[in-house]
Amino acid sequence: MTAIFLMSMVFGLACGQTMSFCIPTEYMMHVERKECAYCLTINTTICAGYCMTRDINGKLFLPKYALSQDVCTYRDFMYKTVEIPGCPDHVTPYFSYPVAVSCKCGKCNTDYSDCIHEAIKANYCTKPQKSYVVEFSI
């Protein structure tokens, strides 16, 4: 009986990890500043995918922090910095953005993640695009 219980626990843990499809995914974002002449298209990675979660029936009896569900979020990330071309001298031309190195299923941390249900559909350029990108690692 102990062997069956142990095997079911191992199988459950293995399936839980494989069913959680949360990985760094390629993402293209457009960056522009009001004062600068050009828009940059940046290829980066973000955390995207599905996480195993379950809904608790006894919601009335639990504290609010116990009701949050896991989301696909950053485990490790680094920042890269690009220079937006065509900026006047009084404007800082640098823009820093996160690059996902690895991801995990966990609580959404508003210190470094945008924890909204639906994204704002503003990922496009309104200015001419510049073809070169100079990156700096920070």
UniProtKB/Swiss-Prot annotation:
Glycosylation sites: 43
Oligomeric form and interacting partners: Heterodimer of a common alpha chain and a unique beta chain which confers biological specificity to thyrotropin, lutropin, follitropin and gonadotropin.
Gene Ontology terms: cellular component: cytoplasm; extracellular space
Gene this protein is translated from: TSHB
Protein name, as recorded: Thyrotropin subunit beta
Gene Ontology MF term list: hormone activity
Residue span(s) of the pro-peptide: 133-138
Superkingdom, natural source: Eukaryota
One GO BP: G protein-coupled receptor signaling pathway
Native source species: Equus caballus (Horse)
Compartmental location: Secreted
Protein family according to the UniProt entry: Belongs to the glycoprotein hormones subunit beta family.
Predominant cellular place of this UniProt entry's protein: secreted
Database matches in InterPro entries: Cystine-knot_cytokine, Glyco_hormone_CN, Gonadotropin_bsu, Gonadotropin_bsu_CS
Coiled coil: none
Disulphides: 22-72, 36-87, 39-125, 47-103, 51-105, 108-115
Functional summary from the UniProt entry: Indispensable for the control of thyroid structure and metabolism.
Swiss-Prot/TrEMBL keywords: Disulfide bond, Glycoprotein, Hormone, Secreted, Signal
Signal peptide: 1-20
Xref: PANTHER family: GLYCOPROTEIN HORMONE BETA CHAIN, THYROTROPIN SUBUNIT BETA
Secreted listed as a keyword: yes
